[in-house]
Amino acid sequence: MQDVADRLDQLERDGYVLIEGALSPQETELVRQRVDHAREMGWEEGLNAVGNMWFDSLLDREPETFAPLVGHPSVRPYLEGMMGKQCQLRSLRAHINPGPYLQEWHMDFYGYWEEKRQVEQYRLAAQPVGVNATYYLQDNGPGDGHLKYVKNGHLLEPPHLYPKDRPKFEAWCEAQEHVVLYPKAGDCVVFWSHIPHQGAKERDDMERSNVVCHYQMTPMYEGIWHVSRPRGYDGTFPFA
């Protein structure tokens, strides 16, 4: 338990934590094969200009393969340690990088800092937060591929977000001090959704794919003691 506590401290301090061997070799190979199968079936949502192909429907199409990744036992201590019962899956997205790939500098939760300001206007509102868990399906290493963060990027609001100026935002990210990770097949990186980050292939012919679980903290969790049943999520926020 002390190791988990230390890693939670690291997650808060650094904005990320690398969990080695989160998936067994068998789990990793199964997920990799099914992501490749999804590509063969044409289930991708698209292929963007930087070389990222993404899939948003795999949890619904193949729950027997992808549902075990949600709150996986190797990752649960970190998700639960940060968010407890208020941890909610927002989405599961798989990626394949079929050719050259240099991801744009980006944040998954761009709205974090503005929401942090807005919440101060209200008596009961809680700060929205998000945490990602990315499972890597191949070995990344120097000369092959990597994951890069802006160092301490979860603690500092980047400029050029309001209004958003992507070229200036990306230039700012590129000019900062970075941390570079080389996750191996089966590793999982858990990180704050608002930290600026960038994935890349250093070798164009490298096979590279991953699965990301986006989590968010939702105070009214399923099973909380209340007299009524929740209607769900979509269309239930009248002031949003």
Regions from the PLM with identified roles:
Residues Y112-G141, V150:
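A contiguous catalytic/ligand-binding core that recognizes phosphate-bearing ligands
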Residues Q127-G130, N140-Q198, M220:
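Double-stranded beta-helix
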Residues M107-Q118, P163-E177, H226-R231:
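Short, surface-exposed loop/helix-turn segments at secondary-structure junctions
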Residues L92-A94, A133-Y135, V211-Y215:
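A structural signal for short, well-ordered beta-strand segments
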Residues A94-G99, Y110, Y136-P142, G153-L156:
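Short acidic/polar capping segments at secondary-structure boundaries
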Residues M1-R13, E20-L124, D234-F237:
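Non-heme Fe(II)-dependent double-stranded beta-helix
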Residues D6, M41, G46-L47, P163-K164, ...:
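Non-heme Fe(II)/2-oxoglutarate
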Residues Y101-D108, E114-R117, G143-V150, P158-Y162, ...:
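A short secondary-structure junction signal
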